């Protein structure tokens, strides 16, 4: 097995280096900035080492086997119907926006990107995994590019909508990536970011046992507050924020709704399950039983 090469970083939100240890998980340390409250992995594996992890077949077809470097997905292709549902829910608040050019950052194998395309958007995707983007291109016929967002020569002021779904926590430098995206977006364009919220009620209760402390895959553990501050600093205005709890927190099923979602789609129960899921999310919001946040913001 490849030896893990660790690196120390400063806070991505405020640049401070003063932290306190929040959790120790296996060989990895999660810290909290004493200045702004951002939670992140420090030290962490070198980003190039993690890129090799994401580039592997085993990451997307791990069979549920966890390694020192990643949790992975038992079979990513079985999430297609669920990711279509996620895409539809994500677009509900912006359904009045006329479809234009869309960029999905962290598009993976392209299932959500495919759904965005079906909804009328001129869709582009980017992901650091060549394995995933090759699938998106060859199997789904999508415009999927391999690499980090700052490596592409998209024109400035080009995109009408940018989506970042459960990806920002993997980014080595979220600030730099968001600054790049800000340049690529038209004035008034919308960015949608969904990520786990470490300041939600469920993470506070479960602490180091919280299901979404995936280390070392997750470099950052944003809260709704730290993510909003980062977006505002870069030049976005917050227009909407929704918080909810994922079923993974309730079932103890750590990486993405494995048990209930599999049953729902295998037995074609979507017509029954989707209203129930929406009700579950509404109750979770009312009780503040949250561990995931979605922020809608526009470029100033």
PLM features: residue spans?
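Short, glycine-/aromatic-enriched active-site segment of Class I SAM-dependent methyltransferases
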Residues: 193-220, 225-232, 254-258
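A short glycine-rich, Lys/Arg-flanked "PGG" loop and its adjoining helix->strand segment in the class I
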Residues: 175-190
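Short N-terminal helix/helix-N-cap motif within the alpha/beta-hydrolase-1
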Residues: 172-176, 203
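A SAM-dependent methyltransferase catalytic signature shared across enzymes that methylate proteins
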Residues: 12-19, 224-242
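Conserved N-terminal segment of class I S-adenosyl-L-methionine
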Residues: 1-165, 175-178, 243-244, 262-263, ...
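Conserved catalytic loop of SAM-dependent methyltransferase domains
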Residues: 239-271
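A transmembrane-helix-recognition feature enriched in membrane-embedded lipid enzymes
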Residues: 265-293
């Amino acid at each position: 097995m490849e030896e893990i090469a660790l690196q120390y970083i400063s806070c991505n939100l405020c640049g401070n280096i003063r932290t306190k240890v929040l959790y120790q998980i296996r060989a990895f340390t999660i810290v909290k900035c004493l200045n702004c409250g951002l939670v992140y992995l420090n030290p962490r594996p070198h980003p190039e080492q993690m890129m090799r992890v994401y580039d592997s077949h085993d990451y997307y077809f791990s069979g549920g086997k966890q390694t020192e470097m990643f949790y992975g997905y038992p079979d990513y292709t079985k999430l297609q119907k669920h990711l279509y549902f996620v895409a539809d829910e994500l677009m509900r608040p912006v359904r009045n926006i006329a479809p234009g050019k869309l960029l999905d950052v962290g598009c993976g194998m392209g299932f959500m990107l495919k759904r965005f395309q079906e909804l009328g958007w001129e869709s582009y995707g980017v992901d650091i995994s060549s394995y995933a983007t090759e699938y998106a291109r060859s199997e789904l016929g999508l415009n999927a590019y391999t690499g980090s967002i700052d490596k592409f020569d998209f024109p400035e002021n080009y995109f009408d909508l940018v989506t970042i779904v459960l990806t920002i926590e993997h980014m080595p430098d979220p600030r730099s990536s968001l600054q790049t995206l800000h340049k690529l977006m038209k004035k008034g364009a919308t960015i949608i970011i969904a990520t786990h919220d470490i300041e939600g009620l469920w993470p506070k209760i479960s602490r180091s046992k919280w299901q979404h402390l995936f280390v070392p895959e997750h470099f950052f553990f944003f809260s709704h507050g730290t993510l909003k501050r980062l977006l505002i600093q870069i030049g976005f205005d917050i227009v909407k924020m929704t918080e909810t709890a994922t079923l993974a927190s309730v079932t103890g099923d750590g990486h993405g709704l494995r048990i209930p979602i599999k049953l729902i789609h295998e037995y074609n129960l979507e017509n029954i399950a989707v209203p129930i899921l929406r009700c579950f999310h509404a109750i979770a919001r009312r009780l503040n039983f949250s561990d995931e946040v979605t922020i809608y913001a526009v470029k100033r």
